[in-house]
Curated annotation (Swiss-Prot):
It comes from the Bacteria. This is Phage T7 exclusion protein. Responsible for the exclusion of phage T7 by plasmid F. Growth of bacteriophage T7 is inhibited in cells of E.coli that carries the plasmid F. It comes from Escherichia coli (strain K12). Disulfide bonds: none annotated. The keyword Repeat does not apply. The gene is pifA. The keyword Zinc does not apply. It holds the Pfam family KAP_NTPase. Keywords: Plasmid. Residues 27-334 form the KAP NTPase domain.
Length: 741
């Protein structure tokens, strides 16, 4: 906690520069030259100097350095009055004239010490000279206050009488009050005779309400004829111009300012290189303070790329403060879950292009839904995203920052070099996903949410889960715990439409698998060979139209076995020979083995690409023969009619054993009418049609090869299913036979 506090600017989150060592933009030299010029201005009349600059450009910092220079170079008769109407909230007339009256009062007492009765009452009496200033302030102010209230505010010498003694009454002022012109002349004479000079500094005028701005300019005009006054006003010209036009109901506020302000100095904009270089240096320093080590070369390279491209949009020192303060606030709590240059990128965009920041969060939110298979966007929604990005990018001044291709280096799924060819939500490769996840990148489905919400995405499991999953899989004694964990994820709703089990499968990518050792991968393979049939059963209960093929379990197991072979081919083959015989999911194993033999054309099929085969032809034949022996055993054949779907299994059995073996089993189970109906119920296939929706049918071309006389079977079924008292399953079979289209 102490270290985190030290990261902040102890003077404030947006504190201005107060001394030359803090100056990063060359304001010190500017302040020295301006202060020198101010001290040489003519004394015969009032002078008004304007320092102009946009919000956050460093006006207050420059002003602080000017004040420091004035304090060092002015003579004893020059008094600097720093007035902040925005902070005080009081009348600027009071804020100016009460300190002036105080200075005159003190100067008169020094030069003309009171004697006798006046010496006794000097704590309670204003000098005539100070009283003239108060009277002039009353005439100038837009609201008249009792004199005792003025006395109570302006002088530390007589402050204590404010609560009780009323020396001058309102009637006393009314009797002795002079005309404003005469008072001004007398005060001017006093200033000359006392050799007093005043430099009045007013900051943050652009933060005032329009009516307050008008009051400040009325004050400046009121003092315009007084000699020895120099006003330094700091403001954003555009804002002040609009405020004057609104408050005074005039058309051209700029022309009005020209009448009031005799000299104006526009704050030079810092060099773009200086701004982005400062951001990068402070960002690197922050990283080192938090991590106790400097960023590595790759991170430095990415940080330079971010600042050179998106840091070029920085226009004021305040924008740097805002971006760095955000990093100080966010990064310590999320450093283990984000990539620092990506976080810097987001904060730069948030400060310089807030609309793009909001677009990015919305885009990544929707992309997460699409990439995890939980939903999709319509063409209209995609078009809205596209138009939104085009609008956001047009606000960038820097040429590289407005490039879609440049943005695509940081935000995934973007392609196209101009508006016409811009595409969003483009798919990415599994390797890309893994690299981004490993690097904790903004483009990672696992980590993107941390960058916006201090937390992980609610629809994505964190990397820690998968680390623990593999570690558990690598310990044989924990196989039961592993199975319970994974099977429990089938019943847990992890997202809008899927389960955590499906999410886990989608995350078991080749990139993630390549980081694990042999035992860990073998443990997961063991789970699938033992429990995939149970997985299928559980999902079928949840969804009668469920298809195991769509879950990509086969692909995950292939990735695991491929990596295991790369580590130790002999151990992998030995494990496979064991699992195809002992694995408790023979129906899924049949499907997986059919994929393997098709890779080598062992089912009299066309070979897609032998180079993509998981095992060699010899090993595949050996595995096929061993599993065929298991399929031909009565123990397994007795379980077949317990399955809800058998057509795929029969084809796998045919490809690994023989068609005649399968037909012989069919003959045996169809010797009775009940057996025939039970078998055909399990030979239905699911169909999804755009005009009919989901339905089941008996695909005659797929089912008939397993029967000696299919037409005779159909005739028999027609008779059997023609009655009025059919079970729901028989009714479904009758409909399925009619649906063969």
């Amino acid at each position: 906690m102490k270290i985190l506090r030290q990261l902040w600017n102890q003077k404030g989150l947006d504190a201005a520069v107060e001394d030359v060592p803090e100056d990063r933009y060359g304001f010190g030299n500017i302040a020295e030259n301006i202060s020198r010029s101010i001290l040489t201005l003519p004394l015969e009349a009032s002078n008004v100097v304007g320092i102009e600059g946009a919000w956050g450009s460093g006006k207050t910092s420059l002003l602080n350095l000017i004040l420091r220079n004035l304090a060092l170079k002015k003579d004893a008769h020059t008094h600097v009055l720093h007035i902040s109407p925005w902070l005080s909230g009081g009348s600027p007339v009071e804020a100016l004239f009460l300190p002036v009256a105080t200075v005159i009062q003190q100067e008169m007492e020094i030069r003309y010490p009171p004697k006798g009765f006046k010496k006794l009452w000097r704590k309670y009496l204003l000098s005539p000279e100070a009283q003239k200033v108060i009277e002039y302030a009353q005439d100038t102010s837009s609201r008249v206050l009792p004199l005792v209230q003025y006395i109570g505010q302006f002088s530390s010498i007589i402050n204590w009488i404010a609560g009780g003694i009323k020396v001058f009454s309102d009637s006393r002022l009314a009797v002795d009050q002079k005309t404003t012109t005469k008072l001004r002349a007398e005060i001017a004479g006093q200033l000359v005779s006392l050799d007093l000079k005043f430099i009045v500094v007013m900051d943050d005028l652009d933060r005032l309400e329009p009516s307050q701005v008008a009051e400040v300019f009325r004050l400046v005009r009121a003092v315009a004829d007084l000699p020895r006054f120099t006003h330094i006003l700091c403001y954003d010209r555009q804002i002040i111009t609009h405020a004057v036009e609104h408050a005074l109901n005039i058309e051209d506020g700029s022309r009005y300012l020209q009448k009031i302000i005799q000299l104006s100095f526009k704050l030079p904009r810092p060099e773009a290189f200086d701004l982005r270089n400062e951001f990068r240096q402070r960002a690197e320093a922050l990283y080192q303070q938090i991590n106790n080590q400097p960023p590595d070369s790759g991170m430095v390279r990415d940080l330079i790329a971010v600042t050179d491209t998106y840091g070029a949009a920085l226009s004021t020192p305040r924008e740097i403060h805002q971006a760095i303060n955000s990093l100080i606030f966010l990064y310590p709590g999320m450093r283990d879950f984000v990539y620092f240059p990506d976080l810097c990128l987001l904060q730069l965009i948030r400060v310089t292009n807030p609309a793009l920041y909001d677009w990015t969060e919305h885009y990544l939110t929707e992309r997460s839904v699409i990439e995890t298979g939980q939903g999709m966007l319509s063409d209209g929604e995609k078009a809205d995203f596209r138009e939104g990005l085009i609008r956001c990018m047009k606000t960038f001044r820097a040429s590289n920052a407005d490039s879609f291709l440049t943005l695509a280096d940081w935000i995934p799924g973007i392609s196209g070099h101009n508006d016409e060819y811009l595409n969003l939500f483009e798919p990415v490769s599994e390797d890309f996903r893994h690299i981004q996840t490993t690097g904790k990148r903004l483009s990672s489905l696992t980590h993107w949410r941390y960058y916006f919400a201090f937390s992980s995405p609610q629809n994505v499991l964190p990397p820690e889960f998968f680390r623990q999953l593999f570690e558990q899989a690598g310990v044989s004694e924990k196989q039961q715990q592993l199975s319970e964990l994974l099977l429990s994820k089938i019943n847990s709703v992890g997202s809008l439409s899927g389960t955590w089990f499906e999410h886990i499968l989608s995350r078991l990518t080749p990139g993630l698998i390549r980081e694990r050792n042999f035992e860990e991968c073998a443990g997961l393979v063991h789970f699938f060979f033992d429990h995939t049939d149970e997985v299928s059963t559980r999902f079928s209960i949840r969804n009668p139209w469920f298809s195991l093929r769509e879950m990509a379990i086969n692909e995950v197991v292939r990735h695991l076995l491929k990596h295991m072979q790369d580590i130790d081919e002999t151990r992998t083959i030995t494990l496979m020979e064991k699992l195809i015989v002992t694995g408790a999911s023979p129906f899924w194993i049949a499907d997986f083995m059919r994929d393997l033999i098709w890779e080598h054309g062992l089912a009299q099929n066309a070979v897609p690409s032998p180079s993509d085969a998981l095992f060699s032809r010899d090993i595949t034949e050996r595995l096929r023969d061993r599993f065929a022996e298991r399929m031909n055993q009565p123990e397994l054949q007795q379980q077949l009619l317990l399955r809800k779907s058998l057509l795929g299994y029969l084809y796998a059995w045919r490809d690994m054993s023989s068609g005649e073996t399968v037909k012989q089993w069919v003959r045996e189970v169809t010797t009775t009418d009940e057996g025939l109906v039970n078998l055909l119920i399990r030979l239905q296939t699911s169909v999804f049609s755009s005009h009919r929706g989901a339905y089941r049918r008996i695909a005659r071309d797929q089912v008939s090869p397993f029967f000696d006389d299919w037409p005779a079977v159909e005739e028999k079924l027609k008779v059997m299913l023609s009655g009025n008292e059919l079970t729901p399953e028989q009714e479904a079979l009758k409909t399925a036979l009619e649906n063969d289209d």
